[in-house]
Amino acid sequence: ANLSRPGTPASFVDTGAWSTKAIAEARHFGEVRVLGSSADSKFDHIPTVDWADADGSSFLHITTNNTIYGTEYESLPDSPEGVPLVIDASSHIGSRPMPLERAALGYAGAQKNLGCSGLCLVFIRRDLLDDPDAPPAPKCLRYATHAKANSLFNTPNSFGVLVLKLVLEWVEAQGGVAAMERLNAEKSTLLYTTLDNSSLFEAHACAGHRSRMTIPFTLGGAPEGERDALTARFLAEANDEGFQGLKGHRSVGGCRASMYNAFPVEGARALTSFMQEFERRA
């Protein structure tokens, strides 16, 4: 609502559940132009888009990491001149260096890499805060309101802010965001290598589009009639070994390994070893 303009479409790329929800909400405020979608292949890749097609839009919106389907933008696009780039970076902000200065507006829930749920980080270009052409919106939903009040327009989530502070101090002590990038690359490479070399396990996301944060996979190499039972057995045995929360999202099924910043490299090594041992017995 903050950037929408009457009679001017907003451009989106549909890469999964969270961008789909954003598109649906944006339609309450005006016309939406979907530049590309990978829905037909269950969002297993980032669709190829001609960014020039966003020319004349009120803004261009992308979801930079897609938790359910395990895809991630490697870089931010070049938005046409005069079209603000808006990014939802909720599920991978803080996982690697990002050229955030290329985005006019970005938002990220804290609950993945920055802290606990109930807190949202927003960064916005200053000229957009005082835009005279901004559409009317409830005061509490305007970014300018919160910026002018130093994020104290209403009582903030003080515990969430404290946890954010502690997490950022921890990240800095580990070597900063660059260190997080190295660790996350090591963890995800371990699992993707195991998946790509397996005749039982299969990654959902296509190579070249894969997320370092969430890695959905199936036991697609199992006979179709045995796949569900074998998946249930794998999840049960994994849980017994201490690997919790591996069940995939209900819209995709299968399994999903979450490897956010706090997940250690040792955990990735242990998981891949267990998967290889399970495949030998299956």
Can you describe what each PLM-predicted range is?
Residues 5-20:
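Conserved PLP-anchoring active-site segment centered on the Schiff-base-forming lysine
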Residues 11, 59-63, 86, 107, ...:
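Structural motif
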Residues 26, 38-93:
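Active-site phosphate-binding strand-loop segment of PLP-dependent enzymes
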Residues 110-193, 206, 282:
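Active-site C-terminal subdomain of aminotransferase-like
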Residues 201-238:
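Conserved PLP-binding catalytic core of the aspartate aminotransferase-like
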